[in-house]
Amino acid sequence: MEHLTRIGIVLPYFGKLPNYFPLFLTSCRHNPTINWLVYTDSDQEMDWPENVKVTKTTFDAFRARLQQNFDFPICLDNPYKLCDFKPTYGDTLAEDLTQYDFWGHCDCDLVFGDLRHFLTEEVFQDHLRILCCGHLSLYKNVPEVNRYYRTQPYIDYQNVLQSPGAFSFDEWPGLSECWLRDGMPYYGKLIYDDLTVGVEDFRPINITPGGFIGPYHNEPDESRRFRKMKNILYRWNLGKLERCWVEKGQLRQEETAYVHMQKRKMSYDPDVISGLSFLIVPGAFLPDRELSAAVLQEFAPVSCSMATRIRLLKDGIKVVLAEVKNIGRKGYCSRSAIVNHIKTYWSNTYK
């Protein structure tokens, strides 16, 4: 039997769990060869899968544990600041991760598909880091990778960990940019759907200012293909997640690794959602049903208000201006990437 890379994904979460957290856990359960390590103060009743290891702890106790690893006072006043500490977990939580070949961090506003279908053994053999966003990243569990965040001349990690506010240290333009600059072997293919924030309908690539567009430097053709999809919804069925959309009047379906529903309110009624299959549509989880182009047009209409269009256009201008300044920086951005950004924002604004 082939040896599978052992994976442990860290998820600290303090406060009330999201209303659709049971569906997140269901999607974890259907990835039985991957473990999740959840640190939480929640007493909510949950059907915890065997591959989700729960450590009950308070936010103050978790902060104290992280502090033990640094000889300077860290600033961790609220759970959101944990985003900047994600790249440190291989170092700060090392005792909990010794059994894993790769460790990672994730968010819980996700529904996973079949991760092993996309993250093959060849991917793990050839890379030190898998994916490059805060909602899911995996790292080879070796000292030079676990302490990589301490070694960067581009970013003062002490300043990041000592300061309030968010630095996006876990992704772009934080350590992910450092990996790119240093030519470190990381796997950054667009195997997931990171939904655009602040847009009513589903668009599978997130377009915001501040560097989140960074991963799409890798595959401009793929991101361009995503932008042409309309009437998008998702079907989860027995561990498989499919993106469904309408193209030239026809229903199209394609498997994806996971969908990230950042900053979206999603209604969820556990009494009507089967644990075997369900649909994810803008604003809700629904029971599964037979799909057609007409069904997608009904439940996932293309919708973008004028206020949203104006915001997207402003965000696009900000990012393009920032990227113009980056032309020529080592391993970062090219003129072709600038052109791709302009096309991205134009498409998302006037789609």
What is each stretch, according to the model?
Residues 25-35:
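Short, acidic, metal-binding catalytic loop of nucleotide-sugar glycosyltransferases
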Residues 11-13, 38-40, 106:
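Short beta-strand/turn micro-motifs composed of small residues
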Residues 148-294, 298:
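Catalytic core and acceptor-binding pocket of nucleotide-sugar-dependent glycosyltransferases
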Residues 86-131:
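GT-A fold catalytic core of metal-dependent nucleotide-sugar glycosyltransferases
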